[in-house]
Amino acid sequence: MGVRGLHGFVASSCPHVCTVVNFKELAERHRSQHPGGTPTIVVDAMCCLRYWYTPESWVCGGQWREYYSSLREFVRTFTAVGIKLIFFFDGMVEQSKRDEWVKRRLKNNREIAKIFHYIKSRREQPGRNMFFIPSGLAIFTRFALKALGQETLCSLQEADYEVASYGFQNNCLGILGEDTDYLIYDTCPYFSISELSLDSLDTVMLCREKLCQSLGLHLADLPLLACLLGNDVIPEGMFESFRYKCLTSYASVRESCDRKGNVILAVAEHISKVLRLHQGEKKLEEMLPLGPNKALFYKGVASYLLPGQKSPWFIQKPEDVVTLDKQVLSMSSDPESKQEFPVCMDSESKQKLPVGTDPEFNLEAPMCTNTEVKQEDPVNVGPEAKHQVTVVLDPEILKVARAQHVQAESYLVYSVMSSGEVECSNSLEDATDQALPSQAFVYRPVRQRVYSLLLGGGGGGSSTGPAVKEWFVYSGNPLRQPDLVRPLQMNIPGGTPSLRQLWLSQEPGIQAQRLDTLLACFDLSSSREELQAVERPFQALCCLLVYLFVQVDTLCLEDLHAFIAQALCLQGKPTMELADLQLDHIDPRAVQLATLLVRGLTTLVLVNGACGSPWEMADFMPWHLFDGKLFHQKYLQSEKGYTAEVLVEQNRSHVTRFHTLKSVVCKACGKESRPIVSRRHWRPHHAGSRQYEPDQWRRY
């Protein structure tokens, strides 16, 4: 993440850039300097997931109760010293960073393959050096933090820009994260999450002013340096020959630095001693070998400019207007609030700021002049840029979706409605297991019905509505382009209600309509009565299990027993007891089953939000319904043929509930002509009859 090689360079060659600080002391100093103000830290949550996930077990699907406790302790520690935390999550992938996103996903695929190879050969979880965050962690962390009373925001563009903007505009104490881009932005101080000691509240502050002193640069030079070294916008190889030329003419090569370190020093010297001589006189393309990449390069440099900031590397021409592919977003919880810097209300808004490069580049400026949505054609800045066409035209509905997205109250809904493009990162799935399909395929029909609901899909099975671009990771998908997925017709008794009805209506009976719509997304309208009779929080679980077992015909009765038993036993079980649970061994199939269930819960977040929230969000949060190790234990026991009484640990009330929930799921599956039978009735290595070849889905 961030600038290529900069983290290692700072750690090895510029240790004085890193200073140990104490958050309690910083907060006290901030209060004395700003009486009445609350010391606030902006947290780049995506950078912190690995730090927050402290449970020892990570391969079984997630230790969600332990994780929730870890988050609660993190929040409590900062609250105790009077520090307010604002959490930001990535809400979208910018087009200029899509290639980098794909590269990381393919790299993650290789890491996951190694994890499953290890599990199969050792029958145990790999060490922390192979750690991979549990599926759905980022999504559920948002809701966990909100449940803990924290202000949690989801970005409308790359989160690091919004984090830096918020810190810059609100005089924050600092940014907490792990991304060298925060050394490049001219914003509030940057603190390392990986160096944080929660016991003492000590961490490391990385000082961009000291970095500039070491490199002989000014703060305004750092965006230029970042792009010449390579970052998430500019591929590292783009200026490889240029960096080599800088290195060959660099006279002060340090033996204490590795080659990458000397390259950084050489490029910095070239900026300070060669390029700066012509700053303000020559355009960048006259001083650098930009070639056909000049628009992308200008865009990369400008992407570090926060609201109101200018770059001395852009020749000032007041008549020229730079239009950056970026928008400044309202960071306030009140979408109507007025701020010092105007706020763009939609992705079509154009923001203009006279930072004055040559108009042929037509980059976007990080500022807009009003909050009106302007329906004007975007200027093409090259093949890497993509204009997001708003798919939903009802401005009130789009405004509601946007507000819910920013407040981290929904998942994927606004992305579908505003750009028609969604993504889902890697899951712990075994690419060699032909019997279990990827979660991307299992839940695709649900997503298709949601697309129909959100985009107004027509009838006749596969809709003629606009296709949604899906960047979902699954085995065999090279991610060279998105899958084009058409909406699928909804079958709802009485017809499909409008989004205005589902989201805005207060009429009596609307809650029943919302539930009907949710069940129709899972194609389970016929089982409404049975599912409604189930007590909370098991309604959502049963809905998910029925859908799973209908979709995946390689699931058996033993799997159902394990899913139900772990959900029942989880209720009231102390967190420490879950943490102390020991497993005989790790089964790769159980790992993937856990992934299927957890990804089902994230799908429920999408569906529930799209349908106007007929169910309370808490009913399908994993810390209420799922524990990875507990499920794994029940799976291993069920495989051995343990009775229901043993599976639910001899708890009489659990035995009754177990049979009730099992009956509901089996009866609902029976209506879909899907009997659930024991594995003992199968022939060896039963692979199921459904085919999940990627190409059949691409036809959509």
Curated annotation (Swiss-Prot):
<keyword id="KW-0539">Nucleus</keyword>
<dbReference type="InterPro" id="IPR026784">
    <property type="entry name" value="Coact_PPARg"/>
</dbReference>
<dbReference type="GO" id="GO:0005634">
    <property type="term" value="C:nucleus"/>
</dbReference>
<dbReference type="GO" id="GO:0035357">
    <property type="term" value="P:peroxisome proliferator activated receptor signaling pathway"/>
</dbReference>
<dbReference type="InterPro" id="IPR029060">
    <property type="entry name" value="PIN-like_dom_sf"/>
</dbReference>
<protein>
    <recommendedName>
        <fullName>Constitutive coactivator of peroxisome proliferator-activated receptor gamma</fullName>
    </recommendedName>
</protein>
<keyword id="KW-0805">Transcription regulation</keyword>
<keyword id="KW-0010">Activator</keyword>
<dbReference type="GO" id="GO:0045444">
    <property type="term" value="P:fat cell differentiation"/>
</dbReference>
<keyword id="KW-0221">Differentiation</keyword>
<keyword id="KW-0804">Transcription</keyword>
<comment type="subunit">
    <text>Interacts with ESR1 and RXRA. Interacts with PPARG; in a ligand-independent manner.</text>
</comment>
<comment type="similarity">
    <text>Belongs to the constitutive coactivator of PPAR-gamma family.</text>
</comment>
<comment type="function">
    <text>Functions as a transactivator of PPARG and ESR1. Functions in adipogenesis through PPARG activation.</text>
</comment>
